[in-house]
Amino acid sequence: MYPNWGRYGGSSHYPPPPVPPPPPPVALPEASPGPGYSSSTAPAAPSSSGFMSFREQHLAQLQQLQQMHQKQMQCVLQPHHLPPPPLPPPPVMPGGGYGDWQPPPPPMPPPPGPALSYQKQQQYKHQMIHHQRDGPPGLVPMELESPPESPPVPPGSYMPPSQSYMPPPQPPPSYYPPSSAQPYLPPAQPSPSKPQLPPPPPSIPSGNKTTIQQEPLETGAKNKNAEQKQAAPEPDPSTMTPQEQQQYWYRQHLLSLQQRTKVHLPGHKKGLVTAKDVPEPIKEEAPVPATSQIAEPLAAEEPPLPPPNEEMPPPLPPEEPQNNSSEMSEDPEEDARLKQLQAAAAHWQQHQQHRVGFQYQGIMQRHTQLQQILQQYQQVIQHSPHIQTMSLDVQLRHYEMQQQQFQRLYQEWEREFQLWEEQLHSYPHKDQLEEYEKQWKSWQGHMRATQTYLQEKVTSFQAVKNQYMGNMAMPPPFVPYSQMPPPLPTMPPPVLPPSLPPPVMPPALPSTIPPPGMPPPVMPPSLPTSVPPPGMPPSLSSAVLPPPSLSSAGPPPVLPPPSLSGAPPVLPLPPLSSATPPPGIPPPGVPQGMPPQLTAPVPPASSSQNSQVPEKPRQALLPTPVSFGSTPPSPYHPPPQSEQGNSKPLNKVFSSEQGLGESSSALSQSVIAAKDTPVKSGGLLADPPKGSFLEGPRGPREQKEQLQKLKDFGSEPQTADHLPPPDSRLQNTSRPGMYPPPGSYRPPPPMGKPPGSIVRPSAPPARSCVPMTRPPVPIPPPPPPPPPPPPPPPVIKPKTSSVKQERWDEDSFFGLWDTNDDQGLNSEFKRDTAAIPSAPVLPPPPVHPSIPPPGPMPMGMPPMSKPPPVQHTVDYGHGRDMPTNKVEQIPYGERITLRPDPLPERSAFDADHAGQRDRYDRDRDREPYFDRQSNMTDHRDFKRDRETHRDRDRVLDYERDRFDRERRPRDDRNQSYRDKKDHSSSRRGGFDRPSYDRKSDRPPYEGPPMFGGERRTYPEERMPLPAPSLGHQPPPVPRVEKKPESKNVDDILKPPGRESRPERIVVIMRGLPGSGKTHVAKLIRDKEVEFGGPAPRVLSLDDYFIAEVEKEEKDPDSGKKVKKKVMEYEYEADMEETYRTSMFKTFKKTLDDGFFPFIILDAINDRVRHFDQFWSAAKTKGFEVYLAEMSADNQTCGKRNIHGRKLKEINKMAEHWEAAPRHMMRLDIRSLLQDAAIEEVEMEDFDANIEDQKEEKKDAEEEESELGYIPKSKWEMDTSEAKLDKLDGLRTGTKRKRDWEAIASRMEDYLQLPDDYETRASEPGKKRVRWADLEEKKDADRKRAIGFVVGQTDWEKITDESGHLAERALNRTKYI
């Protein structure tokens, strides 16, 4: 896994760093060792020779990255890592930061690993890790003998890699970061410091990396770095104390935000990067590696990973840039920016807001949980490296078991995801965590897509079982590749390449790669193919030779490998494949081999390479570039030039990122190389330029997919793919054919690189001629004989389709086969290689691969991806895998789409619309990556409609498409398509137009595009955005919600919500006159005060219309008329605008003063322009703005409004009412009105009680005045009794008698009396006699209780203890 990253994920480390470190040449010897070594050594060699090429690659990558940054914010992610650079060092997986890099070659070997046992790969991995720790990178290279095994980690078997990946990264969180760091480190290979630099913030570390890269020479440093890395990663989230974690996360968080601002990118990726560093990032990254691994074996599965990978890749690209920084001109900028970011990060850290820290920490911990699930997911999704070489039954069982395991994991994920979502929503600054949110949501879509994918995989295998059983025979070809296995590692390199390849490849390709020594041959073919030259020269000379050259020249490829971190010799290629085989290896790795293939010597190359490659890494059958070369070597070797071209294209891709011009030249060079290579087919070269390049990218991804598919189907697909590609594909413009072959090669990439990475690289390769070359070679090498299988190509497609085509169909096929397709794919590729416009062909690569492999990935993967446009399913995984790649944005389903586009059909389409394709490619290149992607989606749909064959090819494909379509409404697609078309037409004119130009078009998509997964979402959102056509509101773009976001007023005013509410709030009231705006404003103010807040400032436009008026009133006392000054509301329409302007000034001053954290704006605001300026001003000052819209029917408003506005006016206002922009948050004030209504009722009840109390008081007073209580009715029984008492002189508290309760309370008195007395008392209606003495006694008691009262006290009564006085009362006579 790491390897994948390293490049983009685990693997990425390898490619980027190598570029900068010239010392890597030392490593070169390792690569140098020989073909056998080639895999493992290749990494080393690649590092040295690759370093130069790496530099160039870095430059190219840098540009790509920059574009990616802007488009995907991946760069930002890197910056995030910057602070975590130490963490990155944790490339535990790599073993030692440096060692691992050295091992990159081993990672490359892992590709062979596919053949190799997964365990072996893992073994190797561990060894590598140990070596790295020890600091003997050499060791790893030495292990190269079984480099495939070691490489397994990266490509060997993506699965193993992921597993290793996961385990190596001791801390899961660090795990990812390490992968980031590690990948970078590997690039730094030369110096351990580099590993440190590799820290996730590739971009930021770029400067450091440069330095480090130079340092890399020291193994000790390496070890240290590795240790640091390990430590850092762990410290990252796991080791740190909660406080440290919080700071670390927060710092990264802020960093990403800052970077986003700087880059003016959605920042989506940035967030990811940060996330990466943080557990979340790890999660993403880990998933990515897993994906890569899975992708390699299981394209479909890979796709899931891609999302993380994409995220991962984004960071890697930055890292690559860092690596580039050492050798790239852009590096300086990157470095400067990184330094800025670092400084900013430090600053942010110091000024962290501790208040939200803990909440943030909780969210990050939840991220860790999700990441752990993703890590398990990676393990579940892993495939044995050789899964694709196994029988359909075995694969079917494998997927069925995987599906069961995944179901449990998926349920757990859903649970955790919901918890995380709840936590996030309660987080006050969740808008700052948009990147995380998008990332996890894209993962959510990814998990769902994986579920669907696994189901489809099982279904497709069952359906394909019969179809492909025949093709299974094809596996033999692959078997040769099996021998090629060594090359397989190459595949892994591709994995790595994704992250690093682009940068590494381009730089190394031109010159560094040559250093290995192969360069001469490769280099001659094409500048970029410096690396290829090592392997290429032979390939050029003869198909066979190239492969060996590759394997033996592995070192040269190695250079690329560093970038690719794939099979050493092959690896170099892989890097190329990832990065566009910087060296001769057509980035895919197959490219190098392919050139030979291209050459007539397909078979020879195959044998040669096989023999040679086998030596190195048998493991990587397809993956190894050599293996590629071997199977497709013959064809590919001719492609060597092509590849060289490819590598150049890679450079181009990078350069394309850097500058279209360069990519263009690279393209032409690659084309020229192809022409030189014509051996394979002029068509290849000729077509390639147009489609081949385009296809190339596709090819790589597809290749990978195909490889995987072949593995899945036993290589049978490869044969089909290969054969057809050479013939029909080449004819097709090589776009379909060629790429498909690459596709077959592609499979290798899957190994190490996530499909995404491959995809991405694939785009670059497309740029490079490799795709062209590849098309000829296609996967045919093994199937060279099977050329007859031209039909198979379609089949292959299906086969691939099951795995690769799924994605390719949508992703690569669209661009590859159709002009539209091209456009779709190309659009992606072009976006990546915006610079590559010159070579529309290149665009195809971008189509899908590029998308997936944002910058670097394309490089590593492109070679692979290129040839295999055919790959359907695999790419599905790739797309996902390439978190960086736009592909990821394509819904899982789409990518997975098995429906294979018949290569022929595509090619036919291409041929028909070659011109159009070129134009499309150009547009695509011009278009921003994302736009292209969106376009691609549309194209895909379009293509689908147009090409029934595809659907007919596979019902599964169709279903997948349907799934994709559902995921992404066609509307979205169409819209994006339309947008793209418009843009493309404008773009057409300026081929050179940087992708940045397109940015504006993409804004809506931008956020999501970063995460491929979101892409689908964005388009949907985007559609809605247009809807919010409150024309005014371009601002809506920020929150392009289908439904405007709404917040309940209780969540802001009442606890517990008010604890987590934004610190500064503005509420804008809007509604018709009389709708209750002022009333609600007062309610809000009162509520705020009620819960302990300061009284909000209420700014009302009505206040401006209140004037002082003199009124004549009658003085009630004198009856005279008196003039009084009164404040009255007088509406003056003429003054409204003036008053509004005045109020706006007041509002701004209030914002600036900062005395009022809560401001309420009370005005009609019937037009958006009336309140839009307020909204903007408040937002600028950091206020959260809520829109409270009052609703009431016109009649009610007419009656209620206190300002005398007429119903006519109100109706007119309502008719011309403007809806608020969607991006403005709504405030739901219904609960406030309900509370107010309830309170009113309560008040009434309360009033009633008060009245009762008043009544009682009055009664008491009356009693005191001896007027008696106020009777309810004169004749009530009570009354008579009361009167009797009065007559008897026994006045008692009448108040008590008032109700029966009072009477009951007096029962005690009655109980003391004789029965006769009680009886008589019970006859209130009759006059009766009372016991005067008893009554007198009671009266005395009462008086005693009252005490002395002036003027009333009867001392006799009070002092009469014995009762004599009372007895005397019996003698008194009373007259009644």
Swiss-Prot record:
Residue span of region Involved in interaction with PPP1CA: 1326-1333
Show the cross-link location (Glycyl lysine isopeptide (Lys-Gly) (interchain with G-Cter in SUMO2)): 886, 943
Gene Ontology CC: nuclear speck; nucleus
Composition-biased stretches, type Basic residues, lie in 261-271
Which spans does this entry mark as compositional bias, Low complexity? 31-50, 59-80
Presence of the UniProt keyword Electron transport in the record:
no
**InterPro entries (UniProt xref):** P-loop_NTPase (IPR027417), YLP_motif_con_p1 (IPR026314)
Alphabetical list of Pfam families matching this protein: AAA_33
UniProtKB keywords: Isopeptide bond, Methylation, Nucleus, Repressor, Transcription, Transcription regulation, Ubl conjugation
Q: Which GO terms describe its molecular function?
A: DNA-binding transcription repressor activity, RNA polymerase II-specific
What ranges does the record give for the region Disordered, renumbered to this chain? 1-335, 511-1058
Spell out the Basic and acidic residues composition-biased ranges. 277-286, 698-714, 896-930, 937-1004, 1013-1023, 1039-1058
Q: What tissues is it present in? A: High level expression seen in the brain, adipose tissue, heart and kidney, with a low level expression in muscle, spleen and lung (at protein level).
Compositional bias per record (Pro residues), positions renumbered to this chain: 14-27, 81-93, 102-114, 148-158, 166-176, 184-204, 303-320, 511-537, 545-594, 632-641, 738-753, 773-796, 840-870
Oligomeric and partner information: Interacts with PPP1CA and NCOA5. Forms a complex with ILF2, ILF3, KHDRBS1, RBMX, NCOA5 and PPP1CA.
Write out the function statement from the record.
Plays a role in the reduction of telomerase activity during differentiation of embryonic stem cells by binding to the core promoter of TERT and controlling its down-regulation.
- Official protein name in the record: YLP motif-containing protein 1
The organism of origin for this protein = Rattus norvegicus (Rat)
What gene makes this protein?
A: Ylpm1
